[in-house]
From Swiss-Prot:
GO BP term, pick one: GDP-mannose transmembrane transport
Region (Disordered): 319-345
One GO molecular-function entry: antiporter activity
Topological domains annotated Cytoplasmic: 1-8, 62-78, 128-131, 183-194, 255-264, 310-345
Organism: Schizosaccharomyces pombe (strain 972 / ATCC 24843)
S-S bridge residues: none
Subunit structure and binding partners: Homooligomer.
Alphabetical list of NCBIfam families matching this protein: nst
Species lineage: Eukaryota, Fungi, Dikarya, Ascomycota, Taphrinomycotina
InterPro entries: TPT_transporter
Record protein name field: GDP-mannose transporter
Cleavable signal peptide: none
Compartments (UniProt record): Golgi apparatus membrane; Cytoplasmic vesicle membrane; Endoplasmic reticulum membrane
Chain segments annotated as transmembrane: 9-29, 41-61, 79-101, 105-127, 132-150, 162-182, 195-215, 234-254, 265-285, 289-309
Gene: vrg4
Length: 345
Protein backbone atom coordinates (compact mmCIF):
# COMPACT_ATOMS: atom_id res chain seq x y z
CA UNK A 1 0.00 0.00 0.00
CA UNK A 2 1.61 3.30 -1.11
CA UNK A 3 1.96 6.46 0.97
CA UNK A 4 -0.80 8.21 -0.98
CA UNK A 5 -3.32 5.51 -0.06
CA UNK A 6 -2.22 5.54 3.60
CA UNK A 7 -2.57 9.33 3.65
CA UNK A 8 -6.10 9.10 2.22
CA UNK A 9 -7.10 6.51 4.81
CA UNK A 10 -5.66 8.57 7.69
CA UNK A 11 -7.68 11.61 6.57
CA UNK A 12 -10.94 9.71 6.01
CA UNK A 13 -13.56 10.60 8.66
CA UNK A 14 -15.14 7.13 8.66
CA UNK A 15 -12.22 5.14 10.04
CA UNK A 16 -11.53 7.31 13.14
CA UNK A 17 -15.24 7.52 13.98
CA UNK A 18 -15.70 3.74 13.76
CA UNK A 19 -12.43 3.16 15.63
CA UNK A 20 -13.48 5.50 18.44
CA UNK A 21 -16.84 3.75 18.82
CA UNK A 22 -15.26 0.29 18.80
CA UNK A 23 -12.62 1.26 21.39
CA UNK A 24 -15.26 2.79 23.66
CA UNK A 25 -17.55 -0.24 23.43
CA UNK A 26 -14.65 -2.68 23.86
CA UNK A 27 -13.42 -0.98 27.03
CA UNK A 28 -16.86 -0.91 28.66
CA UNK A 29 -17.63 -4.53 27.76
CA UNK A 30 -14.26 -5.88 28.93
CA UNK A 31 -14.63 -4.01 32.22
CA UNK A 32 -18.13 -5.42 32.66
CA UNK A 33 -16.86 -8.91 31.84
CA UNK A 34 -14.25 -8.76 34.60
CA UNK A 35 -16.47 -7.04 37.16
CA UNK A 36 -19.39 -9.40 36.58
CA UNK A 37 -17.24 -12.50 37.09
CA UNK A 38 -18.63 -14.53 40.03
CA UNK A 39 -17.07 -13.39 43.28
CA UNK A 40 -14.83 -10.71 41.75
CA UNK A 41 -14.00 -8.09 44.40
CA UNK A 42 -10.56 -6.68 43.51
CA UNK A 43 -11.53 -3.52 41.66
CA UNK A 44 -8.39 -1.61 42.62
CA UNK A 45 -6.26 -4.42 41.16
CA UNK A 46 -8.19 -4.21 37.90
CA UNK A 47 -7.62 -0.45 37.72
CA UNK A 48 -3.91 -0.89 38.58
CA UNK A 49 -3.48 -3.34 35.69
CA UNK A 50 -5.35 -1.01 33.33
CA UNK A 51 -3.23 2.03 34.20
CA UNK A 52 0.01 0.04 34.00
CA UNK A 53 -0.90 -1.42 30.60
CA UNK A 54 -1.92 2.05 29.41
CA UNK A 55 1.41 3.65 30.45
CA UNK A 56 3.36 0.78 28.88
CA UNK A 57 1.35 0.99 25.64
CA UNK A 58 1.76 4.73 25.15
CA UNK A 59 5.46 4.37 26.05
CA UNK A 60 5.86 1.84 23.22
CA UNK A 61 3.91 4.07 20.82
CA UNK A 62 6.15 7.01 21.73
CA UNK A 63 9.30 4.99 21.03
CA UNK A 64 7.81 4.00 17.67
CA UNK A 65 7.10 7.71 17.02
CA UNK A 66 3.38 7.04 16.53
CA UNK A 67 2.50 9.53 19.28
CA UNK A 68 4.40 12.08 21.31
CA UNK A 69 4.09 13.51 24.81
CA UNK A 70 6.25 15.33 27.34
CA UNK A 71 8.98 13.56 29.27
CA UNK A 72 8.32 13.11 32.98
CA UNK A 73 8.97 16.23 35.04
CA UNK A 74 8.75 16.09 38.84
CA UNK A 75 7.45 19.67 39.14
CA UNK A 76 4.66 19.01 36.65
CA UNK A 77 3.88 15.69 38.35
CA UNK A 78 3.55 17.39 41.74
CA UNK A 79 1.26 20.01 40.21
CA UNK A 80 -0.85 17.34 38.44
CA UNK A 81 -1.11 14.79 41.28
CA UNK A 82 -4.45 16.09 42.71
CA UNK A 83 -6.01 15.50 39.27
CA UNK A 84 -4.74 11.92 39.23
CA UNK A 85 -6.15 11.41 42.72
CA UNK A 86 -9.56 12.56 41.45
CA UNK A 87 -9.13 10.18 38.51
CA UNK A 88 -8.69 7.27 40.93
CA UNK A 89 -11.91 8.26 42.72
CA UNK A 90 -13.72 8.55 39.39
CA UNK A 91 -12.62 5.23 37.89
CA UNK A 92 -13.13 3.33 41.16
CA UNK A 93 -16.70 4.58 41.61
CA UNK A 94 -17.32 3.86 37.92
CA UNK A 95 -16.09 0.28 38.37
CA UNK A 96 -18.37 -0.23 41.38
CA UNK A 97 -21.38 1.22 39.56
CA UNK A 98 -20.71 -0.95 36.50
CA UNK A 99 -20.32 -3.98 38.77
CA UNK A 100 -23.83 -3.60 40.21
CA UNK A 101 -25.73 -2.05 37.28
CA UNK A 102 -26.39 -3.31 33.76
CA UNK A 103 -24.45 -1.73 30.88
CA UNK A 104 -27.52 0.07 29.43
CA UNK A 105 -28.49 1.58 32.81
CA UNK A 106 -24.88 2.57 33.50
CA UNK A 107 -24.60 4.20 30.05
CA UNK A 108 -27.84 6.15 30.47
CA UNK A 109 -26.95 7.43 33.94
CA UNK A 110 -23.55 8.64 32.73
CA UNK A 111 -25.49 11.37 30.89
CA UNK A 112 -26.27 13.01 34.24
CA UNK A 113 -22.59 13.88 34.57
CA UNK A 114 -23.00 16.22 31.60
CA UNK A 115 -25.56 18.26 33.56
CA UNK A 116 -23.30 18.60 36.60
CA UNK A 117 -20.35 19.62 34.43
CA UNK A 118 -22.44 22.14 32.50
CA UNK A 119 -23.53 23.95 35.65
CA UNK A 120 -20.01 23.67 37.04
CA UNK A 121 -18.82 25.52 33.94
CA UNK A 122 -21.50 28.16 34.54
CA UNK A 123 -20.25 28.68 38.10
CA UNK A 124 -16.49 28.56 37.54
CA UNK A 125 -15.80 29.24 33.86
CA UNK A 126 -18.52 31.68 32.83
CA UNK A 127 -20.41 29.20 30.68
CA UNK A 128 -24.10 29.42 29.90
CA UNK A 129 -26.94 26.97 29.27
CA UNK A 130 -29.21 27.54 26.27
CA UNK A 131 -32.87 26.56 26.06
CA UNK A 132 -32.07 23.61 23.77
CA UNK A 133 -29.33 22.43 26.14
CA UNK A 134 -31.78 22.66 29.03
CA UNK A 135 -34.28 20.60 27.02
CA UNK A 136 -31.63 17.92 26.45
CA UNK A 137 -30.95 17.88 30.20
CA UNK A 138 -34.64 17.28 30.82
CA UNK A 139 -34.55 14.31 28.44
CA UNK A 140 -31.46 12.96 30.21
CA UNK A 141 -33.16 13.11 33.59
CA UNK A 142 -36.31 11.51 32.16
CA UNK A 143 -34.31 8.69 30.53
CA UNK A 144 -32.53 8.02 33.82
CA UNK A 145 -35.82 7.87 35.74
CA UNK A 146 -37.31 5.47 33.17
CA UNK A 147 -34.13 3.35 33.21
CA UNK A 148 -34.17 3.10 37.00
CA UNK A 149 -37.87 2.21 37.03
CA UNK A 150 -37.41 -0.46 34.35
CA UNK A 151 -34.33 -1.83 36.11
CA UNK A 152 -36.09 -2.13 39.47
CA UNK A 153 -39.18 -3.70 37.87
CA UNK A 154 -37.27 -6.38 35.95
CA UNK A 155 -34.13 -6.94 38.02
CA UNK A 156 -33.55 -10.29 39.64
CA UNK A 157 -30.99 -8.77 42.03
CA UNK A 158 -31.73 -7.98 45.63
CA UNK A 159 -32.87 -4.43 46.30
CA UNK A 160 -29.78 -3.83 48.45
CA UNK A 161 -27.54 -4.59 45.45
CA UNK A 162 -29.51 -2.20 43.25
CA UNK A 163 -29.36 0.53 45.88
CA UNK A 164 -25.58 0.07 46.09
CA UNK A 165 -25.32 0.37 42.31
CA UNK A 166 -27.24 3.65 42.19
CA UNK A 167 -25.31 5.04 45.15
CA UNK A 168 -22.02 4.30 43.38
CA UNK A 169 -23.46 5.83 40.20
CA UNK A 170 -24.27 9.10 42.02
CA UNK A 171 -20.78 9.17 43.52
CA UNK A 172 -19.31 8.51 40.09
CA UNK A 173 -21.24 11.39 38.51
CA UNK A 174 -19.96 13.74 41.23
CA UNK A 175 -16.33 12.57 41.11
CA UNK A 176 -16.41 12.53 37.30
CA UNK A 177 -17.59 16.14 37.21
CA UNK A 178 -15.00 17.18 39.82
CA UNK A 179 -12.25 15.47 37.83
CA UNK A 180 -13.29 17.05 34.53
CA UNK A 181 -13.69 20.58 35.91
CA UNK A 182 -10.43 20.43 37.88
CA UNK A 183 -8.56 18.98 34.91
CA UNK A 184 -9.89 21.70 32.63
CA UNK A 185 -8.41 24.35 34.91
CA UNK A 186 -5.06 22.56 35.22
CA UNK A 187 -4.83 22.02 31.45
CA UNK A 188 -5.18 25.76 30.93
CA UNK A 189 -2.29 26.34 33.35
CA UNK A 190 0.00 23.57 32.04
CA UNK A 191 -0.98 23.63 28.35
CA UNK A 192 -1.04 19.81 28.36
CA UNK A 193 -2.07 18.03 25.16
CA UNK A 194 -4.02 14.76 24.96
CA UNK A 195 -1.21 12.29 25.55
CA UNK A 196 0.53 14.52 28.10
CA UNK A 197 -2.68 14.33 30.10
CA UNK A 198 -3.03 10.60 29.57
CA UNK A 199 0.60 9.91 30.55
CA UNK A 200 0.50 11.88 33.80
CA UNK A 201 -3.02 10.76 34.74
CA UNK A 202 -2.22 7.06 34.45
CA UNK A 203 1.37 7.16 35.71
CA UNK A 204 0.53 9.13 38.85
CA UNK A 205 -2.55 7.03 39.57
CA UNK A 206 -0.54 3.78 39.69
CA UNK A 207 1.07 4.29 43.15
CA UNK A 208 -2.30 5.35 44.60
CA UNK A 209 -4.01 2.29 43.12
CA UNK A 210 -1.22 -0.04 44.29
CA UNK A 211 -1.51 1.26 47.86
CA UNK A 212 -5.31 0.91 47.73
CA UNK A 213 -5.26 -2.65 46.42
CA UNK A 214 -2.57 -3.78 48.90
CA UNK A 215 -4.20 -2.27 51.97
CA UNK A 216 -7.94 -2.47 51.24
CA UNK A 217 -8.34 -5.69 49.23
CA UNK A 218 -8.00 -9.30 50.34
CA UNK A 219 -4.80 -10.85 48.96
CA UNK A 220 -5.27 -14.22 50.65
CA UNK A 221 -4.81 -17.35 48.52
CA UNK A 222 -8.51 -18.15 48.88
CA UNK A 223 -9.63 -14.76 47.59
CA UNK A 224 -7.12 -14.80 44.72
CA UNK A 225 -8.50 -18.19 43.70
CA UNK A 226 -12.03 -16.79 43.91
CA UNK A 227 -11.19 -13.80 41.72
CA UNK A 228 -9.08 -15.78 39.25
CA UNK A 229 -10.51 -19.31 39.10
CA UNK A 230 -8.34 -21.70 37.04
CA UNK A 231 -10.95 -22.15 34.31
CA UNK A 232 -11.41 -18.39 33.82
CA UNK A 233 -8.04 -16.92 34.88
CA UNK A 234 -6.71 -16.40 31.35
CA UNK A 235 -9.92 -14.74 30.16
CA UNK A 236 -10.05 -12.35 33.13
CA UNK A 237 -6.38 -11.34 32.79
CA UNK A 238 -6.76 -10.90 29.02
CA UNK A 239 -9.85 -8.71 29.51
CA UNK A 240 -7.91 -6.57 32.01
CA UNK A 241 -5.10 -6.05 29.50
CA UNK A 242 -7.49 -5.34 26.62
CA UNK A 243 -9.34 -2.72 28.67
CA UNK A 244 -6.03 -0.95 29.33
CA UNK A 245 -5.13 -0.95 25.64
CA UNK A 246 -8.66 0.21 24.81
CA UNK A 247 -8.19 3.32 26.95
CA UNK A 248 -5.20 4.22 24.75
CA UNK A 249 -7.34 3.56 21.70
CA UNK A 250 -10.07 5.88 22.96
CA UNK A 251 -7.63 8.73 23.52
CA UNK A 252 -5.85 8.24 20.19
CA UNK A 253 -9.03 7.87 18.13
CA UNK A 254 -10.59 10.87 19.92
CA UNK A 255 -7.69 13.06 18.82
CA UNK A 256 -7.78 11.49 15.35
CA UNK A 257 -11.53 12.10 15.03
CA UNK A 258 -11.20 15.77 16.01
CA UNK A 259 -8.23 16.24 13.67
CA UNK A 260 -9.90 14.90 10.51
CA UNK A 261 -13.46 16.10 11.18
CA UNK A 262 -14.32 18.73 13.79
CA UNK A 263 -15.00 19.05 17.49
CA UNK A 264 -18.72 19.22 16.68
CA UNK A 265 -18.60 15.91 14.81
CA UNK A 266 -16.71 14.38 17.71
CA UNK A 267 -19.40 15.60 20.10
CA UNK A 268 -22.11 14.07 17.91
CA UNK A 269 -20.24 10.77 17.65
CA UNK A 270 -20.04 10.61 21.43
CA UNK A 271 -23.81 11.09 21.61
CA UNK A 272 -24.60 8.53 18.90
CA UNK A 273 -22.20 5.99 20.42
CA UNK A 274 -24.44 5.53 23.46
CA UNK A 275 -26.97 3.56 21.40
CA UNK A 276 -24.65 0.76 20.16
CA UNK A 277 -23.00 0.67 23.60
CA UNK A 278 -26.35 0.11 25.32
CA UNK A 279 -27.36 -2.47 22.70
CA UNK A 280 -24.04 -4.29 23.15
CA UNK A 281 -24.80 -4.49 26.87
CA UNK A 282 -28.18 -6.04 26.11
CA UNK A 283 -26.67 -8.57 23.71
CA UNK A 284 -23.55 -9.68 25.58
CA UNK A 285 -24.73 -9.60 29.19
CA UNK A 286 -28.35 -10.71 28.93
CA UNK A 287 -29.73 -7.48 30.38
CA UNK A 288 -33.54 -7.66 30.43
CA UNK A 289 -35.14 -6.29 27.25
CA UNK A 290 -38.39 -4.63 28.28
CA UNK A 291 -40.51 -1.75 27.04
CA UNK A 292 -39.09 0.41 29.83
CA UNK A 293 -35.44 -0.43 29.13
CA UNK A 294 -35.81 0.15 25.37
CA UNK A 295 -37.65 3.43 25.99
CA UNK A 296 -34.92 4.58 28.37
CA UNK A 297 -32.19 3.76 25.84
CA UNK A 298 -34.00 5.66 23.08
CA UNK A 299 -34.58 8.66 25.36
CA UNK A 300 -30.93 8.62 26.38
CA UNK A 301 -29.89 8.43 22.74
CA UNK A 302 -32.18 11.31 21.72
CA UNK A 303 -31.02 13.43 24.66
CA UNK A 304 -27.42 12.92 23.57
CA UNK A 305 -28.20 13.97 20.01
CA UNK A 306 -30.12 17.05 21.18
CA UNK A 307 -27.24 17.97 23.48
CA UNK A 308 -24.71 17.61 20.65
CA UNK A 309 -26.87 19.82 18.40
CA UNK A 310 -27.17 22.41 21.18
CA UNK A 311 -23.39 22.46 21.65
CA UNK A 312 -22.96 22.76 17.89
CA UNK A 313 -25.23 25.81 17.82
CA UNK A 314 -23.34 27.39 20.73
CA UNK A 315 -20.03 26.79 18.97
CA UNK A 316 -21.38 28.23 15.71
CA UNK A 317 -22.53 31.39 17.47
CA UNK A 318 -19.20 31.70 19.25
CA UNK A 319 -17.00 31.23 16.18
CA UNK A 320 -18.54 30.36 12.79
CA UNK A 321 -15.23 29.09 11.47
CA UNK A 322 -14.96 26.32 14.02
CA UNK A 323 -17.80 24.29 12.56
CA UNK A 324 -15.81 23.61 9.39
CA UNK A 325 -13.42 20.65 9.47
CA UNK A 326 -9.71 21.46 9.16
CA UNK A 327 -10.26 25.25 9.10
CA UNK A 328 -8.85 25.68 12.58
CA UNK A 329 -6.27 24.13 14.86
CA UNK A 330 -7.66 20.86 16.24
CA UNK A 331 -9.27 21.14 19.64
CA UNK A 332 -7.67 19.00 22.30
CA UNK A 333 -9.76 15.86 22.52
CA UNK A 334 -9.34 15.81 26.27
CA UNK A 335 -10.71 19.33 26.48
CA UNK A 336 -13.62 18.44 24.22
CA UNK A 337 -14.23 15.28 26.21
CA UNK A 338 -14.47 17.41 29.32
CA UNK A 339 -17.25 19.44 27.76
CA UNK A 340 -19.07 16.31 26.64
CA UNK A 341 -18.21 14.08 29.66
CA UNK A 342 -16.58 9.70 28.08
CA UNK A 343 -14.26 6.39 30.62
CA UNK A 344 -12.90 6.56 27.17
CA UNK A 345 -13.83 3.73 27.74
Amino acid sequence: MDNHMLNRISKSPILPVVSYCMASILMTLTNKYVLSSPGYNMNFLLLTVQSTVCVAAIGILKRLKVINYRDFDFREAKFWFPISFLLVAMIYTASKALQFLSVPVYTIFKNLTIIIIAYGEVLWFGGHVTALTLFSFGLMVLSSIVAAWADIQSSSFASQTLNSGYLWMVLNCLTNAAFVLAMRKRIKLTNFRDFDTMFYNNLLSIPVLVICTLFTEDWSAENIAQNFPPDAKFGVLMAMAISGVSSVGISYTSAWCVRVTSSTTYSMVGALNKLPLAIAGLVFFDAPITFGSVTAILLGFISGVVYAVAKSQQQRQKDPATILPMTHNPVSASSQSMRDSLSKS
